[in-house]
Amino acid sequence: MENIKNHPAPDQLDSFDKYPPYYGQDLELAYTPQRSVFTLWAPTASKTRLNIYSSGEGGNPEEQLEMEPSDDGTWRIAVERDLNGSFYTFQIEKEGKWLAETPGILAKAVGINGDRAAVIDWNQTNPEGWESDRAPELKMYSDIILYELHHRDFSIAPDSGIRNKGKFLALTETGTKTPEGQASGLDHLKELGVTHIHILPSFDYGTVDETRLADKTYNWGYDPKNYNVPEGSYSTDPANPVTRIREFKEMVKSLHRNGMRVVLDVVYNHTASVDRSNFNLTVPGYFYRQNADGSYSDASGCGNETASEREMVRHYIVES
């Protein structure tokens, strides 16, 4: 580990352009059964810590571990045991104050409501045949027949004939019909000759409380929370980090098998919130465009907009 004196002092980073970029592939978790290495890019933090939990919600952390700084704007710690099935958050201290916990900005698996990141065995997320799955060949752009859909809207009707209503798995069911005998769901898309499915946001967003799905809270998903994790309300078990990923993959595999390519709508230009966003809880201010008076720019019309002109924001979007 680098000595703390080599870490860029927060008070020296008076311009976003001075924040040291980090392009390593180990952000934010590198897992093996033998050890997990956590690496957080937080160049303005004075301290950071890792909180390890046994569950995705509630309770106190089983461990709180101080992370060690490096001279590239990152903080690191290695845990020398198998953490599969555990959950974790990061926290940073800035200007003498510990900010709220965050799963980080690059979490790929989370617990319910996306508040804690999860350590999982990625092999468990692969449905049978996933390794050989390929999108259907596209020969000419003029052949495209595009169909846009929202996961919940597409299958939620009581008379849709679909068992997994409002879920990723709805797009894996065949032989479904309406009471009038018309094809529904996936069979309806095939009837139309659709070649491409454009799916409204599929990734973890903030509006729907995944512990209260009976409330039928609705949103299109344009309020992103965790960009790299499938939305839990579209899973049959939002509390299980593996389930939401495996079911998302099953959906993609099913669409490919039925001759359709998948286009994913991802909302990179703004986030659901600002002050409690994972971006601002990790590197405060950096990921958002601001006006001259320090207020947040709002060209998105959603209260904030991400600063894609900054190096690590661009890098984040490309890598995500």
Task: Please report, for each region that a protein language model flagged, where it lies by residue.
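Short proline/glycine-enriched turn/loop motifs at strand-loop junctions of beta-rich domains
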Residues: 41-48, 83
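Structural beta-strand segments of beta-rich domains
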Residues: 34-38
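Solvent-exposed serine/threonine-rich low-complexity stretches and specific carbohydrate-binding patches
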Residues: 61-70
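Beta-strand cores of secreted/periplasmic/IMS beta-sandwich domains, seen most often
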Residues: 39-40, 195
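Substrate-binding/active-site clefts of carbohydrate-active enzymes
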Residues: 152-320
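The feature marks proteins involved in alpha-glucan
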Residues: 1-33, 69-175
